[in-house]
Structure formats: C-alpha cells, structure tokens
Amino acid sequence: MKFFADRHKIDYPMLGDPDSTIIKAYGVLNPEATGMQKGFARPGYFFIDARGIIREKYFDPKYRERITGNSLIAKLFPELGEEVTDTVEAPFLKLALEQSDRIGVPGSHITLVAEVQLPPDVHVYAPGAQGYKPIKLELDPVAQLELKPALYPQSHVLYFAELKERVPVFDGTFRITQDVKVNTGAEFWGSLGKDGKIFTITGKLDYQACNKTTCFKPTSVPVKWSLQVVPLDRVRAPEDIRHK
C-alpha cells in the first residue's frame, strides 16, 4: 500500500487490512476472489458521517465498472465536486459546463454537468410541460462511451391565471447532470497505449425562456466537454512485499 501511495503521491491516511477484518465487518468481502486477490473487497464507497454512521453506500454490480471518487462527491456535495470547464453566454441565461473528472480509466463513471443560471423573473419549462419547449440536454453518441440518461432537478409548478394553466418550470440556478461510462472491453483497453486517448463529448442544450409576459423563441446552445481516458495502473509492487 505504501508503494502504491508513494507512486501516486497520496498524502491522506490509508487503512491497511491484511487479514480482511474491516472488509468482513462491512460485509463487502468478495468470496469469489482467489489467488493474489483472495481477501479483497468488492470495490465501492461508504459515506460515513462524523458519528461513524453509514449514510450512503455506492457499489456497482460489475467489478470493472465504478463511479469515480470525484463523481461521488459531486452527487453528495454538488458545490464541491465539479470543475468548471467552460462558461457559455446564451440568450436569457448563463451556462457553466462542469465535469467531475478530466481523466478516467476503462469502467469509470464520469459526471457531466450543465449549470443554468436564469435572470430574475425568467423561467424555462421542465420536462413534461405540454404545449411548450421543455429544456433538454442532448449529447451526441461517442464511440467507447456510454451516455446515461440526463437527470433533471425537481421542478415547481407555475400557475398562469390568464390561461388557467399549471406548468412545470425551473428558475433561478439549477443543474442538469449526465453520467458517462467508459468502455471496459479488452480491445479498447489495448488501444489506449501509454498516454491514453482524448474524447470530445458534444451536444446541445435546447430550451425556451419566458418571463411574466413573453415567451421567447426556442433556442439551442452547443455544449462540449473533453475527457482523457488512460490505461489502468498495472505496475506491481516489488515481489518481496506483494500480497500473498
């Protein structure tokens, strides 16, 4: 563990568990692991509060697929978890493009974010609004990346007395998130080389902005993120300190 931490310049405390005592206590021992992997835990995360109580846990059903630490922080604490990669000036709103990670590995789940800031008294329509143009984040397909469905925040209902309509809307500042999963196939692993590959993720944000008196023309704004995918770290520790 020290060999790994030194190579990756990890300076926070790490827990050694040579007999898998802690792993078993948390119920995450992988009973199917054999050989050098015997005693390993199933990879995942626990969110533990200051009193030692488990508040959340995150485990993926497939061993090679997992959410990144930054992506997890982005879900638990959105104000801490993303890095702004671009700011877009668009009609009737400000758009900040963020992502949990700039670098991933095969199997990583990366979170992309479109943070929308609307002026006072301006709203956009939420998914499900009838007769209007709801806001929609739409990404273009990218080979080797699986695009998960976009997630929208909770909307609220705006009542138009003149029309006797109730319509779901967003206003103020809100975030649309979309996870991207990197391919885990062996052929893709082999194609990455030493420095990996850079993938450009493009798409658009469609919306229709309105104020108290006017609904403006539907608008589409281009969006773009960049993700570098690097090969997994396969460097082994010296033989005399390897896990037996």
Residue ranges and their predicted role:
Residues 19-20, 51, 142, 183:
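Solvent-exposed coil/turn segments that connect beta secondary-structure elements
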Residues 73-244:
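Extracellular/lumen-exposed scaffold segments
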Residues 6, 27, 53, 77-81, ...:
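Sec-exported extracytoplasmic/periplasmic mature domains
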Residues 37-97:
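Thiol-/selenol-based redox modules, centered on thioredoxin-like
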Residues 1-42:
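Short, internal strand/loop/helix patches
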